[in-house]
Design a protein with these regions (language model features):
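Short cysteine/histidine-rich zinc-coordinating motifs and their immediately flanking basic loops
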Residues: 94-101, 196-202
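An amphipathic alpha-helical core segment
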Residues: 185-215, 219
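Post-cleavage N-terminal segment of exported redox proteins
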Residues: 2-65, 92, 102-167, 193, ...
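N-terminal, post-signal-peptide region of Sec/Tat-exported proteins
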Residues: 54-85
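Conserved short C-terminal alpha-helix that flanks the catalytic cleft of nucleotide-sugar-dependent
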Residues: 72, 172-173
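The canonical Cys-X-X-Cys-His
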Residues: 80-91, 141, 169, 179-191, ...
Length: 268
């Protein structure tokens, strides 16, 4: 056999092996998914919305991701530093980071969300003003970081310091609130898959935040979604950044551990 033909055969064998390995991984992933009763909100959407999320050229949330990339590399504050000045290229250093939030912050002695960590770094390292809650800048940067972990499983820390906060989050999830006297669990555990006001009730796994919601016509945080649910049962929403919301996020992350990150997800 001539060398060119041998090289071509080696390339073909390598390609077949690579494709076969990818197929095997897909089969294993599908088998894992089939045995797990938990489902992402993606599985409850129409085929049209699923297609919108899958295609980055159609996914409107990608506009914020692009803005987040620019913010990551922009020098700001009296320190005249960018996020990249400390962390380098996000594509290399941030993969898997969002999957581990909320995480324990030693300085404050409590858990912080990814958006809170961004603002802590901004104030302490860049010497710049904190972004406002739900601002386009904060959502863009949080979205950009979470996007680096797309396809990675949620991996909440097993830090024992988080346990009392996570336990409080679970109690909040199961506590009846508001004039309608409803809990998160009653909707998202007991009624998941049924329909409410024309939309499917999801299991409430935070796999795609920040998400683009058609209802919002923009990107929004998990805190915004939680506050919206509280208003929906006619309860007084917690303030943005409230410890209760962080504790609830901490529990939700544990409840969804192992499910894949989708950011930016698209929802109705």
């Amino acid at each position: 056999m001539t060398r060119p033909r041998a090289a071509m055969r080696a390339r073909v064998v390598g390609l077949v092996f690579t494709v076969g390995l990818a197929g095997l991984r897909a089969v294993v992933w599908a088998a894992e998914s089939a045995s797990d009763p938990r489902r992402s909100g993606f599985d409850f959407m129409t085929p049209e919305l699923q297609a919108m999320q899958r295609d980055d050229a159609l996914n409107p949330g990608m506009l914020w991701i692009k803005d987040g990339e620019a913010l990551w590399n922009r020098n700001v504050g009296t320190a005249d530093r960018s996020c990249a000045s400390c962390h380098g290229a996000a594509t290399a250093t941030m993969r898997g980071v969002a999957a581990r939030y909320p995480a324990f912050d030693t300085a404050s002695g409590r858990p912080v969300t990814l958006s809170q960590r961004i603002n802590l770094c901004r104030v302490e390292r860049q010497r710049a003003p904190a972004f406002g809650f739900e601002s386009d800048e904060l959502l863009a940067l949080e979205g950009y970081l979470a996007h680096q972990s797309r396809g990675q499983p949620l991996a909440p820390p097993s830090d024992p310091r988080l346990e009392p906060f996570r336990a409080r989050g679970e109690r909040l999830f199961r506590q009846r609130i508001g004039q309608l006297d409803f809990s998160c669990a009653q909707c998202h555990d007991e009624q998941a898959g049924k329909r409410l006001a024309g939309s499917a009730i999801p299991q409430a796994h935070p796999t795609g935040y920040p998400i683009y919601r058609l209802e919002w016509q923009g990107l929004g945080s998990l805190e915004r979604r939680l506050r919206g649910c509280m208003s929906g049962v006619r309860a007084e929403p917690f303030a943005y950044g409230a410890p209760e919301l962080v504790e609830l996020e901490l529990y939700l992350a544990q409840r969804a551990a192992g499910l894949r990150i989708e950011t930016p997800a698209v929802r109705p």
